[in-house]
């Protein structure tokens, strides 16, 4: 089972709000997930990012692959370094 850390979309039309979740790569975007590790609100000024660092590091250590967007959010929050290739 390939596990990914990715965004799950919530919110109304044109007003997205995302939860950062750990899910099986075969699950649909808004489908089943294993664990919720934070949220991302791009509409807020400045954008609101809240991540449980302990959970994120735990999932990265067991081999979960972050999506490109989640990887950039992790870099902003300092969870993974800019030179780290996940």
Swiss-Prot record:
Family: Belongs to the bacterial ribosomal protein bS16 family.
GO (cellular component) term, any one: small ribosomal subunit
Biological process (GO), any one: translation
GO MF term list: structural constituent of ribosome
Gene: rpsP
Keywords attached to this entry: Ribonucleoprotein, Ribosomal protein
Keyword Nucleotide-binding: no
Naturally occurring in which organism (per UniProt): Thermoanaerobacter pseudethanolicus (strain ATCC 33223 / 39E)
The protein's name: Small ribosomal subunit protein bS16
Superkingdom, natural source: Bacteria
Database matches in InterPro entries: Ribosomal_bS16, Ribosomal_bS16_CS, Ribosomal_bS16_dom_sf
Keyword Ribosomal protein: yes
């Amino acid at each position: 089972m390939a596990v990914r850390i990715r965004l799950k979309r919530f919110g109304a039309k044109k007003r997205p709000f995302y939860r950062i979740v750990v899910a099986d790569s075969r699950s649909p975007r808004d489908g089943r997930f294993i664990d919720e590790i934070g949220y991302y609100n791009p509409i807020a000024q400045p954008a609101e990012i809240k991540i449980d660092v302990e959970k994120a590091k735990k999932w990265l250590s067991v081999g979960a692959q972050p999506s490109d967007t989640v990887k950039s959010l992790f870099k902003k929050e300092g969870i993974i370094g800019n030179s780290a290739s996940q």
